[in-house]
Amino acid sequence: MTAAFYDLMDFDEVLEKYDPVMGLEVHVELATETKMFSASSAHFGAAPNSNVDPVSLGLPGALPVVNAKGVEWAIKIGLALNCSIAESSRFARKNYFYPDQPKNYQISQYDEPIAYDGYLDVMLEDGTEWRIEIERAHMEEDTGKLTHLGGTSGRIHGATASLVDCNRAGVPLIEIVTKPIEGAGARAPEIAKAYVSALRDLVKALGVSDGRLDQGSMRVDANLSLRPIGQEEFGTRTETKNINSLKSVEQAITFEMQRQAHVLDNGGTIDQETRHYQETDGTTSKGRPKETAEDYRYFNDPDLPPVIAPAEWVEEIRATLPELPWVRRARIQEEWKLSDAEMRDLVNANALDLIIETVEAGTTPDEARAWWVSYLSQKANETGVELEALPVTPAHVARVVALIKEGKLTNKLGRQAIDGVLAGEGDVDAVVASRGLEVVRDDGAIEAAVDEALAANPDIVEKYRAGNTKVTGAIVGAVMKATRGKADPAQVNKLIAEKLA
């Protein structure tokens, strides 16, 4: 199904009539060694149902024990988000039935979260800042993962069978919930994307999660409602679930604004429901009616005591906070002498961390920027993935730069080496060897190619000797073609100048 099958209002017309109100819920999987309430491994990628135990399977008599590292990291996230930390918080049971929830309830936090009343300032594409108010950040356990078979959508509707993998059940989660984001207008999609990007940078800097949207270690639920311009009361919201890329966050918000506006403008009503985001065409589809908190029948978990976080412990954790992303950006901008516009370009391309790591691997800032912001960003756009999801690491880029400096690769050959890494042909040195990319050092072969190119272009030789020294580009191009791009351009230019002197 494509967007053409939906009746949508033009985006500019939406803004003339309606005010969007957003609320974002971001689930962050913590990279602890073990699960939140048991000793099973929490590592991603194991064989299905191999990281399980009586607690995560909900077997009778199994009792949970709180992962202290998970609590510490939850406090660390709360502090970085400028939240107040509760001296005493409690776990609650969120009751619902679904095949990926073996216990038929999820251990979460309800009215006594670990962190509350915070904010995160995010940078927009033009360099302005927008403050996102944080309602709460609470601890909970993740669910299992369902794989639906036999349908066309990959979802449960239309499937003939579903497989359950409980490896993820019980993995520590922090759910970060914003307060309603009002007054964003046309920038609502951009603000949502910037917030998720900033939050991802934050949890990565804290070392508590890899923030991989594509692998599900960070998942976004986007709530959106519209209200007529000037109305105080919020409209009915929808919740688009499990959005897994920055681009998708922006597209999902945009689509829901246009879809809801068309429904309202034609006398319809918005159902309070979940929606599924469709990666293929940027649309959302109907899910299920959205429950209220009362439907989950929360009550304090009788198997778990309150979580006590004395002020002294909180301050000890605060002292361990690393340099936070916005502080690092300011430092890097000053050290690298970047303009505001240059820094915005790096942030907007989500390239800053990759560039910093490439510099740490041995390049200059300018060399690293040239690769990540131009060539590799282009490759990411062509394949429709985030820059960091490319199978190229800062170490790969640093190695290519080193080989270019050593004269073993040209820039063109370096790009071919990166293409090989992207294609899964191995690391840089393996690709250079297998593709035969190293610069030709046979002076005789290069000189012969220069002689042949000069003989084939007498008119250029005549113009050069008449004083127009800028015409040698065609000669250089012919030599590079003859050597399959493996000649050193500096050496070629030197030989041409010597022969035409």
From Swiss-Prot:
Its job: Allows the formation of correctly charged Asn-tRNA(Asn) or Gln-tRNA(Gln) through the transamidation of misacylated Asp-tRNA(Asn) or Glu-tRNA(Gln) in organisms which lack either or both of asparaginyl-tRNA or glutaminyl-tRNA synthetases. The reaction takes place in the presence of glutamine and ATP through an activated phospho-Asp-tRNA(Asn) or phospho-Glu-tRNA(Gln).
Pfam families for the chain: GatB_N, GatB_Yqey
InterPro entries: Asn/Gln-tRNA_amidoTrfase_suB/E, Asn/Gln-tRNA_Trfase_suB/E_cat, Asn/Gln_amidotransferase, Asn/Gln_tRNA_amidoTrase-B-like, GatB, GatB_Yqey_C_2, Gln-tRNA_amidoTrfase_suB_CS, Gln_synth/guanido_kin_cat_dom
EC numbers: 6.3.5.-
Gene this chain is encoded by: gatB
First-tier enzyme category under EC: ligase
Record protein name field: Aspartyl/glutamyl-tRNA(Asn/Gln) amidotransferase subunit B
Family as reported in the entry's similarity comment: Belongs to the GatB/GatE family. GatB subfamily.
Catalytic activity line of the entry: L-glutamyl-tRNA(Gln) + L-glutamine + ATP + H2O = L-glutaminyl-tRNA(Gln) + L-glutamate + ADP + phosphate + H(+); L-aspartyl-tRNA(Asn) + L-glutamine + ATP + H2O = L-asparaginyl-tRNA(Asn) + L-glutamate + ADP + phosphate + 2 H(+)
Sequence segments annotated as region (Disordered): 272-291
Quaternary data: Heterotrimer of A, B and C subunits.
Source organism: Corynebacterium efficiens (strain DSM 44549 / YS-314 / AJ 12310 / JCM 11189 / NBRC 100395)
GO biological process, any: glutaminyl-tRNAGln biosynthesis via transamidation
A GO molecular-function annotation: glutaminyl-tRNA synthase (glutamine-hydrolyzing) activity
Keywords noted in UniProt: ATP-binding, Ligase, Nucleotide-binding, Protein biosynthesis
